[in-house]
Amino acid sequence: LRWDAWLFRGAWRFGTTRFLVLSAVCAVAGAMLHLALHSNDMVPLVGASAAISGQMAAATRFALLAGMPLGGMAAGHNEIYRRPAATLGVLIRDSRVMTFLLVWFGVNAVVGIVGSGTLSSGSIAWEAHVGGFLAGLLLFPLLDPVGTEAPADRV
């Protein structure tokens, strides 16, 4: 399995339009959470990390489960990406998904508490990451065409 296959198959699964909508909504959700927690800050929020975090969260709904591309099956068959996504109930019972979620949130908590550890003077808007991630995790079923219709505008 090539690294770019798992990274970009979410766009293939959604189609271009849905993928861009998910990305934009996750970016806005991340910015809104950051704004809610830092309403008096005068520092602008710049970056795509909330959108990327949302894409990662959306991928957990199908890519980390058993038989899925990152869940131990290295076959390159496209039908893997046509299987219905897991519900939140299934996700919380899957040890691979829970390990990923704990590591992801743990890294963001450490970055939020300790900082990035770099010499740059800027900070990382970890709150935006969390907002984008939660949006992607929760909104995935609303945008996922699998089981209903195949997207006509595949990437």
What are these regions (language model features)?
Residues 1-155:
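A detector for small-residue-rich transmembrane helices and their helix-helix packing motifs
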